[in-house]
Amino acid sequence: MNGFFVMTLAVALSMMLIPVAQRLAPKLGMVDMPDPRKVHSVPVPRVGGWGITIGSLVPLVLVFPGDPLLQSFAAGGLILFAFGLWDDAKQVSHWIKFVGQLLAVGLVVYHGDLYVSRIPFADSLVLSPAIGRPFTIFALVGVINAINHSDGLDGLASGESMLSLIAIAFLGYLSGNALVIGMALATIGGTLGFLRYNTHPARVFMGDAGSQFLGFTLGVLLVYLTQAAYTTASAALPLLLLGLPIADIIAVLYQRISGGMNWFKATRNHVHHRLLFLGFSHFQTVVTIYSIQAALVVGAVLMRYQSDYLVTATYFLVIASLFATLTIAERRGWKLDPQRSSMQLPLPTAVRRLADNPKLRSLPLLIISAVVPLFMLFGALSVEAIPSDFGAVASVLAALVLTQMLRGRAAGSMIMRATLYVTAAFSAYLLVTYPGMAGAFTQKLADTMVFVLAAALGIFIRFLSERKFSTTPTDFLVAFGLVALVLFNRSGTGANATTQFVTYAIVLFYGCEVISERVASRWHLLNWAALATLTIAGVRGLWPGA
């Protein structure tokens, strides 16, 4: 469960850092201006990398302080972060960026002693360090640039990376390697915090500081997973786990080289551009790419023990089918009909009548507004014990909530919102881990509250939230992660407590989000509940006999 603490802290740090960076962006020159090649039409700050990188690294350094590989990874990540900030502010040349990438990768390969020693199709062959290290540097730089170049639409690169990281975290769980799990979940947390600001239309872009760090993290995790942590798995798994970005960058480079163009000149021939040209909306394009990426990473998990030949053949079959379909559609002039491609289903008449009833319309929101605070308090009051470290953190957060309330901050402010998420996660963790003497009853009551909250959220989001709350591609990622956890748990490979905790946390996060979008007062019930929950947890954790 420590991994999910790492993820929760990463989410909170990311969500708190990005608004600060957003205010500094114009002064630092970190603003992405629109041009004919880009999809956005207004200036957008390029500071998402602050939340992704710092939000991911801080929890990892706290949990794995003495690990040599993590030290090298953290140092390399900070180097890429520094070079990325430079590029986000000044638009440096590709050669300067390569210098930063080589420095970061070199640290991991030589100081962290991480390199490829076994390759697909040659199980008995062990590469010497003289060959394995240069090959690893080349491969990691390639992955960094593949993710960097896939960052073309709101939530695209971050979402693709998250899908890969979810699969890597699960494979790390199967291998029993805490570092793989921690690194993957921390980066998922930092990315989730960023996605809060990057769903279409984006308020923040990740910039090079974020995209290079994501590529670096994915590359390091894949090498470590297949070369050290999980050597019984196929050595070809990185193909499926990286998925679409690696094929996309190779296809784009081929088109540039065959067309006599500059290798590094940005063009509009990535997969997402081609889908947009075929009439797909932004939402449809991102969800389509997410779906392909999800299929590939699920394939990696299911085929982890299959032969390298089968894994590689599956990858190339999926990729070849995708590019063949795109090419045929483009040559035939096919366009998606927007009238027939709407993803919104018509509502049944009976449901519409219920949704139009003023009294019934207010009921789901009332349930959400009551159950979320009640669950928070239930978590602090009903559990058997609260660890002292929880008590210390809760006390600090209680002081932060009180300060924010006295300063006039509503639940919708970014700092308050992040604190609410952490409080909800604390309550969920405590109920799952320390249910108390009446454990079965406590769990059933918590399950009932989460079920009622999920039902109210489903009704509210689907039928009653035309203006204030809408589903986004990020919801696809959340649904994918939740379904994956449930399916893996049902197959006997997952941990029941982990699935329960994540389910609780996700439903509570959506509840906090719905309430926060509609709260104007600092004295709202949710704020008071968070303050009371954290205060009780602090007192019970620091003074168990009180």
Where are these regions (language model features)?
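"…together with the soluble PPM/PP2C metallo-phosphatase catalytic core" -> "…together
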Residues: 1-249, 364-381, 394-408, 414-436, ...
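Membrane-interface capping segments at transmembrane-helix boundaries
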Residues: 20-24, 324-340, 517-523, 543-545
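Cytosolic, membrane-interface loops and tails of multi-pass inner-membrane proteins
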Residues: 20-44, 251-283, 334-355
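Juxtamembrane "helix exit" motif at the C-terminal ends of alpha-helical transmembrane segments
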Residues: 60, 297-306, 378-389, 540-541
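Extracellular/periplasmic helix-loop-helix junctions in multi-pass membrane proteins
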Residues: 66, 301-314, 493-497, 546
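C-terminal membrane module of polytopic membrane proteins
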Residues: 273, 277-338
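Loop-to-transmembrane boundary segments
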Residues: 277-289, 352-374
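Charged, amphipathic alpha-helical linkers/stalks
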Residues: 317-368
